[in-house]
Amino acid sequence: MQRLLLLVSLFLVSTLGAAASPIAGQWRFVPERSTDLSPWRVYDLTITVEGDVVTLQRQLAAGRRVHEDTVRIDVSQAVNVVPSAYWPDNRHLGAYMGGDKTMKIRAEWLDQRRLLRLSTDLVLATQQGPRDLNILSDYKVSANGAQLTLTMLRSTRNRPVVYVFRRLTTEEAAKPAAKGKSE
């Protein structure tokens, strides 16, 4: 009986711990504190955490152009292979998803789940031919939980890309995402 009670307690603690991950929530891009988002103007990010699975849902917009994608990552897996037909991060560069059109993502939690670190490998198709790309991404929530900073270092760049987000209030999250204009 004590063993069963212990197992149930451990299950509840692990479930509540995952649900209470400080990084989970709805986030809105803050352009004045971030690297230029070109070619997009709006970036809303929703992060959900269910056990070992983290879901990153992006909504990007500029004018009438809108792009949405969802990436599910199982942090307990050594590598997550995620299909991706489109690379929206810098479409004005003339670089598109190439190779097998997948991202190989390795993930780990740091700092009591306040920081999610991803290492993503993919192949881009460019005018010069296929180009292997590695992106190191840190999603870090502030100590007070109000700000999320996404720092990305690409193997093709010397300087990191830094995006700052603010946590949406319950009222803001209930409204439809902004389309095409930053706030």
What are these regions (language model features)?
Residues 1-4:
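Positively charged n-region of N-terminal signal peptides that target proteins for export
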Residues 6-15:
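Bacterial N-terminal signal peptides
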Residues 19-183:
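Hydrophobic small-molecule pocket/channel-lining residues, especially in calycin-type beta-barrels
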